[in-house]
């Protein structure tokens, strides 16, 4: 089974300017993500950027880069441009891996690609069981529920499913596994433009979750529990220091 990984890498970041080029153990962050994706067995790994500094850094370590417009309103629009420019066939599987996850396990990149290949949905993604009770009621932790076949019924920032009897108690004990969505997607390349042709749904606007557009329009998203929980991505200088420490410890 063949698949391509696309890694968006924007230089501008409100909380961490120049994030893709941040040094981690002597390599820019984007190189770490690239190498993790290569270990997943992808046919091609393409870094999508609108910044020449990122382009030069990628070329310096021998990576493949696709320059994209700086005017995209979403990551999906950027992905569509890459598919068009790189002439990726409509039936080919494309995995979108965020450029700020230098420690993402290669196994889950491969997993989401394999899962899409094995099902009839146009999209697939992953989730992890929530172990921290604080996440259950945290709107920044997106929850997902599926049907018996592993297709998403709904994604929400709210707590779903709501355990009526147990949550009625003062301690709101968590007695069943809830799933937190993680932001890795596999697409059939031809579906990306279909998605962009659809108008945003009201649910998508309310929850601020783009994937709800797919469910609103009657398509399916396959969801599986990740083989391995990925470490948190890098959003802040503090996150960057955590990753640097992890890399330094592994090198000892």
Swiss-Prot record:
It catalyses: 3-deoxy-alpha-D-manno-oct-2-ulosonate + CTP = CMP-3-deoxy-beta-D-manno-octulosonate + diphosphate. Coiled coil: none annotated. Its EC number is 2.7.7.38. Transmembrane segments: none annotated. Keywords: Cytoplasm, Lipopolysaccharide biosynthesis, Nucleotidyltransferase, Transferase. InterPro entries: Cytidylyl_trans, KdsB, Nucleotide-diphossugar_trans. It is an enzyme of class 2 (transferase). GO terms for biological process: CMP-keto-3-deoxy-D-manno-octulosonic acid biosynthetic process; lipopolysaccharide biosynthetic process. Its main location: cytoplasm. Belongs to the KdsB family. This is 3-deoxy-manno-octulosonate cytidylyltransferase. The gene is kdsB.
């Amino acid at each position: 089974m063949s698949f391509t990984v696309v890694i968006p890498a924007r230089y501008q970041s409100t909380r961490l300017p120049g994030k893709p080029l941040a040094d981690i153990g002597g390599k820019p962050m984007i190189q770490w993500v690239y190498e993790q994706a290569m270990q997943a067995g992808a046919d091609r790994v393409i870094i999508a950027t609108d910044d020449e500094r990122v382009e030069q850094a990628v070329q310096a370590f021998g990576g493949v880069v696709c320059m994209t417009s700086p005017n995209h309103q979403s990551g999906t629009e950027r992905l569509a441009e890459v598919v068009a420019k790189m002439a990726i066939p409509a039936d080919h599987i494309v995995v979108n891996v965020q450029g700020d996850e230098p420690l993402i396990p290669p196994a889950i990149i491969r997993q989401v690609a394999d899962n899409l290949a094995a099902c009839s949905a146009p999209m697939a993604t992953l989730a992890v069981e929530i172990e921290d009770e604080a996440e259950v009621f945290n709107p920044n932790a997106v929850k997902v529920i599926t049907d018996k076949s592993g297709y998403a019924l709904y994604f929400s920032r709210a707590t779903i499913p709501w355990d009526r009897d147990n949550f009625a108690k003062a301690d709101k004990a968590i007695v069943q596994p809830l799933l937190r969505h993680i932001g890795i997607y596999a697409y059939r390349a031809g579906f990306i433009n279909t998605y962009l042709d659809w108008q945003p749904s009201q649910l998508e606007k309310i929850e601020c979750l783009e994937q709800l557009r797919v469910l609103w329009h009657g398509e399916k998203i396959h969801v599986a529990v990740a083989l391995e929980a990925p470490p948190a991505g890098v959003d802040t200088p503090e996150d960057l220091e955590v990753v640097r420490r992890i890399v330094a410890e592994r090198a000892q």
